[in-house]
Swiss-Prot record:
Designated name of the protein: Defensin-A
Function: Antibacterial peptide mostly active against Gram-positive bacteria. Has activity against the bacteria Gram-negative E.cloacae beta12.
Propeptide residue range(s): 19-58
Gene of this entry: DEFA
Recorded consequence of changing K2Q: In forms A3, A4, A5 and A2 from strain Liverpool
Induction of the gene: By bacterial infection.
Effect of I4L: In forms A2, A3, A4 and A2 from strain Liverpool
Organism, scientific name: Aedes aegypti
UniProt keyword annotations, A-Z: Antibiotic, Antimicrobial, Cleavage on pair of basic residues, Defensin, Disulfide bond, Immunity, Innate immunity, Secreted, Signal
Signal peptide, first to last residue: 1-18
Membership in a protein family: Belongs to the invertebrate defensin family. Type 1 subfamily.
Gene Ontology biological-process annotations: defense response to bacterium; defense response to Gram-negative bacterium; defense response to Gram-positive bacterium; humoral immune response; innate immune response
Amino acid sequence: MKSITVICFLALCTVAITSAYPQEPVLADEARPFANSLFDELPEETYQAAVENFRLKRATCDLLSGFGVGDSACAAHCIARGNRGGYCNSKKVCVCRN
């Protein structure tokens, strides 16, 4: 039993050391052509429309409901956005009041 534990520990150490081994640095100029995002390739008017319609997913109600603070966190989130408050609906989505 001790030998299996020692072998597993050595295997774990080997994996940790090899995954932490440094790679060759990549120059920013070489990586730039491959790192274009969709927003970089859009025309200006399409870019503005995409930015205006960009919506972040909200997990305030669903994640914090286990702690009993889902509605309070949703209301605080909505107040921070400039609304009068908010609540969690039956689908666990934060609905902000105007």
